[in-house]
């Protein structure tokens, strides 16, 4: 019995040794992983029949699997079926289906992209709604009348006539009968040029801006950076002046596009500083001081003050004394002053427009390096589609940095050459500015009178393409919500798109920006009729 016990123990030990050896044994290749289990099947309890059939069946399916999945030999060179065989290979089809199959969700959009995607305002919502159903007296008389877009159609005929007469000549510029001259001309158009604008256009723009200011101030071409519109000009300048998390103080109401133009990619905050109707929406230095101190307490670094002159949306000029006060405030706080003057040449009021450049020139011992101007040709020359903007800065470091960033926002050379010719045509420019101002003045008064017919009063404007209309007596609830409901009714029932004051950060409900330069005189009666459907149905709330 003792031997038997020892023998059993020996067998168990031998079995454990064999098992351990099996674990230490290197893995077999692919064929052995199939054959070894088959051996167990043949020797199993199923008998000879099962032990024979099952291995044969498994072996058959294994061979079929290999045959179907191995690559076929390539066709001989020159074979007409070589390309087609590769195109219809089962493996290629299998991979294509696998790549195209919607097995998982798409990669996530960035947080920055998501914030842009989700950001919106009634200003842009109205523009989109109008673009989808624009009014036309013949082709779409029931469409939406556009009063939300600051675009000038009043003088397009003047620009169009000049283009017809001079565009071909301007495009060739240095071209002539000589072959070398023609080659030089095409090189000047097709080759790379400075991203911040060619010198000829900088000189022409400096002269045009001086003409806009009626010769009261001169501009240096070396301080000009040209961009593809005033929007990128504003963004590039902001990028150079402030860091993410910094802020600009902005007297409000202000142009609603700045919330996108400045904040989206730079990460700079805009702090509205309310101006009130009781003060004629004038900028208050006291209010700026309070806003600056509040931002400082919250740990926000204020890097500048941003204004528009003429003001957008009120259409008023910033008084010369206020510009002096703003410069003193900027110097005291050691911050920048940015003046958006894109409507400087689109004036029609009795007052005189004064650029911050004129005020700076009058000051002695003042550091001009904190003063910057935004300009463009979209408004004063009705060339919005040409996409030409200007950064004018007295700060050499800002000019250098902005010129480098302008590579992402450069204007095409043919466009620049064409504009050099146009701006150099002094007779055309003088005639255009004179006629355009007359047409603006006439349409402004027609528009204000039309609104007055339906009981809507307008703040007195001196420049720009719009009037600042007070519709507060037509909102049922004196609140932003009540303003929103009136805006909805104007858009959906009257088919008129306007910009609500809340989009401009106006703290007084019921103000709306109404642009009049996309209208013709024949559109005015239609507008009056549509507005009556809203104003006549409202019982004034005060």
Curated annotation (Swiss-Prot):
Needed cofactors: pyridoxal 5'-phosphate
N6-(pyridoxal phosphate)lysine PTM positions: 379
Expression by tissue: Expressed in leaves.
EC number(s) per entry: 4.4.1.14
SUPFAM superfamilies listed in its UniProt record: PLP-dependent transferases (SSF53383)
Keywords in alphabetical order: Amyloplast, Ethylene biosynthesis, Lyase, Membrane, Plastid, Pyridoxal phosphate, S-adenosyl-L-methionine
Domain of life: Eukaryota
Primary localisation category: plastid
Similarity field: Belongs to the class-I pyridoxal-phosphate-dependent aminotransferase family.
Protein name according to UniProt: 1-aminocyclopropane-1-carboxylate synthase 6
Name of the encoding gene: ACS6
């Amino acid at each position: 019995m003792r031997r038997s016990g020892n023998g059993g123990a020996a067998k168990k030990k031998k079995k454990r040794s064999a098992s351990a050896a099996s674990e230490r044994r290197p893995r077999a290749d692919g064929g052995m992983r199939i054959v070894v289990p088959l051996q167990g099947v043949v020797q199993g309890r199923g008998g000879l029949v099962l032990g024979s059939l099952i291995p044969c069946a498994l072996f058959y399916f294994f061979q079929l699997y290999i045959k179907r999945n191995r690559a076929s030999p390539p066709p001989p060179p020159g074979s007409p079926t070589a390309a087609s065989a590769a195109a219809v290979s089962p493996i290629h089809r299998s991979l294509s289906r696998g790549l195209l199959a919607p097995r998982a969700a798409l990669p996530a959009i960035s947080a920055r992209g998501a914030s842009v995607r989700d950001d919106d305002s009634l200003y842009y919502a109205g523009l989109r709604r109008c673009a989808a159903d624009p009014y036309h007296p013949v082709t779409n008389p029931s469409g939406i009348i556009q009063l939300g877009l600051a675009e000038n159609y009043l003088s397009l005929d003047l620009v169009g006539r000049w283009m017809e007469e001079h565009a071909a000549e301007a495009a060739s510029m240095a071209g002539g009968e000589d072959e070398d001259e023609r080659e030089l001309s095409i090189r000047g158009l097709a080759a790379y040029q400075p991203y911040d604008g060619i010198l000829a256009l900088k000189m022409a723009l400096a002269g045009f801006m001086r003409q806009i200011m009626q010769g009261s101030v001169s501009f240096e071409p070396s301080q000009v950076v040209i961009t593809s519109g005033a929007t990128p000009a504003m963004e590039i300048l902001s990028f150079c002046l402030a860091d993410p998390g910094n802020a600009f103080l902005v007297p409000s109401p202000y142009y609603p596009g700045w919330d996108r133009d400045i904040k989206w990619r730079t990460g700079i905050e805009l702090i509205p500083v309310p101006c009130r109707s009781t003060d004629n929406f004038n900028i208050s230095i006291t209010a700026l001081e309070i806003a600056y101190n509040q931002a400082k307490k919250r740990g926000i670094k204020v890097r500048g003050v941003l204004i528009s002159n003429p003001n957008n949306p009120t259409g008023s000029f910033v008084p010369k004394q206020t510009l002096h006060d703003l410069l003193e405030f900027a110097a005291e706080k050691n911050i920048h002053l940015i003046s958006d003057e894109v409507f400087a040449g689109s004036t029609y009021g009795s007052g005189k427009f004064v650029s911050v450049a004129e005020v700076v020139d009058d000051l002695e011992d003042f550091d001009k390096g904190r003063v910057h101007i935004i300009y463009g040709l979209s408004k004063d020359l009705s060339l919005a589609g040409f996409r030409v903007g200007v950064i004018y800065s007295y700060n050499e470091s800002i000019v250098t940095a902005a010129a480098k960033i302008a590579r992402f926002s450069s204007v095409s050379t043919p466009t620049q050459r064409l504009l050099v010719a146009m701006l150099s045509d002094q007779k055309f420019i003088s005639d255009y500015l004179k006629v355009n101002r007359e047409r603006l003045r006439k349409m402004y008064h027609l528009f204000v009178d039309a609104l007055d017919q339906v009981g809507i009063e307008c703040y007195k404007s001196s420049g720009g393409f719009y009037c600042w209309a007070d519709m507060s007596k037509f909102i049922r609830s004196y609140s932003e919500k009540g303003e929103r409901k009136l805006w909805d009714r104007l858009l959906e029932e009257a088919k008129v798109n306007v910009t609500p004051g809340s989009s401009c950060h106006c703290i007084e409900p019921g103000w709306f920006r109404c642009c009049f330069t996309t209208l013709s005189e024949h559109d005015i009666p239609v507008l009056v009729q549509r507005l009556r459907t809203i104003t006549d149905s409202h019982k004034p709330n005060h």
